[in-house]
From Swiss-Prot:
Gene (name only): RBP45B
Predominant place of localization: nucleus
Protein name: Polyadenylate-binding protein RBP45B
Composition bias type Low complexity, residue spans: 20-35, 380-405
Residue spans crossing the bilayer: none
Organism of origin: Arabidopsis thaliana (Mouse-ear cress)
Localisation per UniProt entry: Nucleus
Domain RRM residue range list: 62-143, 155-234, 261-333
Length: 405
């Protein structure tokens, strides 16, 4: 069982001393005495960072992308995790422009490329201290980092019917014991309740092991319940693409209509059918209707609940289906349609082409580095909440729940 984050997102044994450092929400990293507090500009979103030269070669990159962040994991949390390395320069958690909520990923800058590489090799897929059921998810934050970036293929499976106590680590070890090519595992968590949704994903680097696992592990117990295994969208080793659960951090278009449960799917391969689309998206909840307009390279998936549509948007944006990378956004809200016929609703929202939907390309973590100026965050992000905007919600009071990241 995993604990909910303490109030304010501060780890239980990381409470800061009553001093001037508190104005930055500083935490003593891992109980190391004498660690210097972070500079003010690191924690003030409005502060302008000093300009610096953007790296031009792989050996100059000193920034890591970090994903799978919980809504309460802020810059203070990242500092508490990595400042003990002695070479952390700054951190930035990406937030939604409208709500100010954490989008699930961020960036950490180190003093040198070598320092960043040591952290990447040491912490990637390692348990987070004080939260051992959650794993660090790290990668290089630049497309130019060449073969040092993990662009190997990902072959992913869906794992359903998980018990409430199954965490990322438990799921990972369940499969790693039999399949050496397992690269990672993710149990999907409901952001509202903090509880597992009862399903997750496991990534392999070997396609033959993925295929074997789909047969051999179906019905095998994980914790107290037998698992239900199925196919999931996979990354085929193309630079800049992201795996099925890592894409949860992608910045898809926000929809504020509580009644809209429809997802637009762009860039479909011609071989993908309505049934194929339904099988992939049904992993995220009950589906009301699926439609791929004749002759079009896009489709629509309507869920019974908005939360299911949100999860599908987070998980599937930018993955491969049928040989192409799909792009997801919100479809037209049912409250805006003029006809009660579902088929008319879908066709009516299609317009003159995929661009009419205004869907966004999946925001690969590396794409942000084009605007990231090495020593600060003055370019490209545009994620800082506007003045007068409500701050992110505080995490709930500490309690015991079935949790994993």
């Amino acid at each position: 069982m995993m604990q909910q984050p303490p109030p304010g997102g501060i780890l239980p044994h990381h409470a800061p001393p009553p001093s001037a450092q508190q104005q930055y929400g500083y935490q003593q990293p891992y109980g190391i005495a004498g660690a210097a507090p972070p500079p003010p500009q690191m924690w003030n979103p409005q502060a302008a960072a000093p300009p610096s030269v953007q790296p031009t070669t792989a050996d100059e990159i000193r920034t890591l992308w970090i994903g799978d962040l919980q809504y309460w994991m802020d810059e203070n949390f990242l500092y508490g995790c990595f400042a003990h390395t002695g070479e952390m320069v700054s951190a930035k958690v990406i937030r939604n422009k409208q709500t100010g909520q954490v989008e699930g990923y961020g960036f950490i800058e180190f003093a040198s490329h070598a320092a960043a590489e040591r952290v990447l090799q040491t912490f990637n897929n390692a348990p987070i201290p004080s939260f051992p059921d959650q794993l660090f998810r790290l990668n290089w934050a630049s497309l130019s980092s060449g073969d040092k970036r993990d662009d190997s293929p990902d072959y992913t499976i869906f794992v359903g019917d998980l018990a409430a106590d199954v965490t990322d680590y438990i799921l990972l070890e369940t499969f790693r014991a039999s399949y050496p090519s397992v690269k990672g595992a993710k149990v999907v968590i409901d952001r509202v309740t903090g509880r597992t949704k009862g399903y997750g994903f496991v990534r392999f680097s070997d396609e033959s092991e993925q295929i074997r696992a789909m047969t051999e592990m179906n019905g095998v117990p994980c914790s107290t319940r037998p698992m239900r295994i199925g196919p999931a969208a996979s990354k085929k080793g193309v630079t800049g693409q992201r795996d099925s659960y890592q894409s949860s951090a992608a910045g898809v278009t926000t929809d504020n209509d509580p009644n809209n449960t429809t997802v637009f799917v762009g860039g479909l391969d011609a071989s993908v059918t309505d049934d194929h689309l339904k099988n992939v998206f049904s992993q995220y909840g009950e589906i009301v209707h699926v439609k791929i307009p004749a002759g079009k390279r896009c489709g629509f998936v309507q869920f019974s609940e908005k939360s299911c549509a949100e999860e599908a948007l987070r998980m599937l944006n930018g993955v491969q289906l049928g040989g192409t990378t799909v792009r997801l956004s919100w479809g037209r809200s049912p409250s805006n349609k003029q006809s009660g016929d579902p088929s008319q609703f879908y066709y009516g929202g299609y317009g003159q082409g995929q661009e009419q939907y205004g869907y966004t390309m999946p925001q690969d973590p590396n794409a942000y580095y084009g605007g990231y100026s090495g020593g600060g965050y003055s370019g490209g992000y545009q994620q800082t909440p506007q003045a007068g905007q409500q701050p992110p919600q505080q995490p709930p009071q500490q309690q015991q729940v079935g949790f994993s990241y």
